[in-house]
Amino acid sequence: MTKRTLEGTKRKSIRKSGFRARMATKLGRKVLNKRRQKGENS
């Protein structure tokens, strides 16, 4: 049987797009602030 096309690894995706990855850069912090202003996740 063939493998699935998308077999994501949790660790990689979290390191790439998790909260701490966002906080590490200026643009990432901007993203978080915009999301906080939108206020759908709180």
From Swiss-Prot:
<dbReference type="GO" id="GO:0006412">
    <property type="term" value="P:translation"/>
</dbReference>
<keyword id="KW-0687">Ribonucleoprotein</keyword>
<keyword id="KW-0689">Ribosomal protein</keyword>
<dbReference type="InterPro" id="IPR000271">
    <property type="entry name" value="Ribosomal_bL34"/>
</dbReference>
<keyword id="KW-0150">Chloroplast</keyword>
<keyword id="KW-0934">Plastid</keyword>
<dbReference type="GO" id="GO:1990904">
    <property type="term" value="C:ribonucleoprotein complex"/>
</dbReference>
<protein>
    <recommendedName>
        <fullName>Large ribosomal subunit protein bL34c</fullName>
    </recommendedName>
</protein>
<dbReference type="GO" id="GO:0005840">
    <property type="term" value="C:ribosome"/>
</dbReference>
<dbReference type="GO" id="GO:0003735">
    <property type="term" value="F:structural constituent of ribosome"/>
</dbReference>
<dbReference type="GO" id="GO:0009507">
    <property type="term" value="C:chloroplast"/>
</dbReference>
<comment type="similarity">
    <text>Belongs to the bacterial ribosomal protein bL34 family.</text>
</comment>
<dbReference type="Pfam" id="PF00468">
    <property type="entry name" value="Ribosomal_L34"/>
</dbReference>
<dbReference type="InterPro" id="IPR020939">
    <property type="entry name" value="Ribosomal_bL34_CS"/>
</dbReference>
